[in-house]
């Protein structure tokens, strides 16, 4: 063990206690992420020239939050604990035992977007473009919660950047939670904010989010310890990497579709023939 490796102290998982109520660090991170998302959504509404109202944004965020919680839990059970679920279906509802999947959360948010768009007669793509820039800060905050809880740590490393997680043995490991915080939280947020500074084709913002997150997650998974009960799967890839591949392909498809639709719009308009001008011809009289 190198003397330069930092030993992460054991931190009480309870951040704040208010009477009989304990607020855990992970829950606090969720709260911070949701609060920031609401603040940013209100800013986007104020700049939308009436296209979005704050009330509409609040409703969308509520549906999105429920999608994250329900989809994240269902995804974790189906993707990572399916044999346990088959043996004990009630495990799905044991949320207090922990276990959330980001990829399941994406499916949950997608369902929420579709539901909201249909209910309010909005474009699914435009709703997706509105909500995805709000997500990276919450993702980053969640990874900080993982780091504080000493969970989802990385693989063993001899790098001086390795950190010793006391519940993971004496060897230093990649702080993969911090890698994800940096890439999926900070860098992804900056990319999306810079991208939406100009008007973009409908669906391209959501596509960029899917593509960038999928790439970042795929890369970080090489440093993250695979789930012990799953290990590495097909082609030596982790479950997280296998689930990220569809996101990457979907993101590229969304972007290609968005820009193709934008490029075709003017040409379609050019193909519309203008109406013929009416002429007042004198009627021929018959005797």
Curated annotation (Swiss-Prot):
InterPro entries: Lgt. Pfam families: LGT. Pathway: Protein modification; lipoprotein biosynthesis (diacylglyceryl transfer). GO terms for biological process: lipoprotein biosynthetic process. Residues 275-287 have a biased composition (Basic residues). GO terms for cellular component: plasma membrane. Its EC number is 2.5.1.145. Disulfide bonds: none annotated. GO terms for molecular function: phosphatidylglycerol-prolipoprotein diacylglyceryl transferase activity. Its main location: membrane. The chain crosses the membrane at residues 21-41, 60-80, 95-115, 124-144, 176-196, 202-222, 235-255. It comes from the Bacteria. A 1,2-diacyl-sn-glycero-3-phospho-(1'-sn-glycerol) binds at residue 143. It is a multi-pass membrane protein. It is found in: Cell inner membrane. Residues 266-287 are annotated as: Disordered. Keywords: Cell inner membrane, Cell membrane, Membrane, Transferase, Transmembrane, Transmembrane helix. Belongs to the Lgt family. Catalyzes the transfer of the diacylglyceryl group from phosphatidylglycerol to the sulfhydryl group of the N-terminal cysteine of a prolipoprotein, the first step in the formation of mature lipoproteins. This is Phosphatidylglycerol--prolipoprotein diacylglyceryl transferase.
């Amino acid at each position: 063990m190198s003397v330069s490796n930092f030993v992460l102290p054991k931190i009480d998982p309870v951040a704040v206690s208010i009477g009989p109520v304990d607020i855990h660090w992970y829950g606090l991170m969720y709260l911070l992420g949701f609060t920031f998302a609401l603040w940013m959504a209100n800013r986007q509404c104020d700049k939308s020239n009436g296209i979005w109202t704050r009330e509409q944004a609040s409703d969308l965020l509520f549906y999105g939050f429920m999608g994250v919680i329900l989809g994240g839990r269902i995804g974790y059970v189906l993707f990572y604990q399916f044999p346990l679920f088959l043996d004990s279906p009630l495990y799905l509802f044991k949320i207090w035992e922990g276990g959330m999947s980001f990829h399941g959360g994406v499916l949950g948010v997608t369902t929420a977007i579709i539901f909201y768009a249909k209910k309010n007669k909005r474009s699914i793509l435009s709703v997706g473009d509105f909500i995805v820039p709000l997500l990276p800060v919450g993702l980053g905050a969640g990874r900080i919660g993982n780091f504080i809880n000493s969970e989802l740590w990385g693989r063993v490393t001899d790098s001086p950047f390795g950190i010793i997680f006391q519940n993971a043995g004496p060897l230093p490991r990649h702080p993969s939670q911090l890698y994800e915080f940096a890439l999926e939280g900070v860098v992804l947020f900056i990319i999306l904010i810079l991208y939406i500074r100009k008007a973009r084709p409908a669906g391209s913002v959501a596509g960029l989010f899917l593509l960038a997150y999928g790439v970042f997650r795929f890369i970080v998974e090489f440093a993250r310890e695979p789930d012990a009960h799953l290990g590495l799967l097909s082609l030596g890839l982790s479950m997280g990497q296998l689930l990220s591949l569809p996101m990457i392909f979907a993101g590229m498809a969304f972007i290609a579709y968005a820009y193709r639709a934008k490029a075709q719009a003017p040409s379609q308009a050019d193909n519309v023939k203008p109406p013929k001008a009416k002429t007042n011809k004198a009627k021929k009289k018959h005797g």
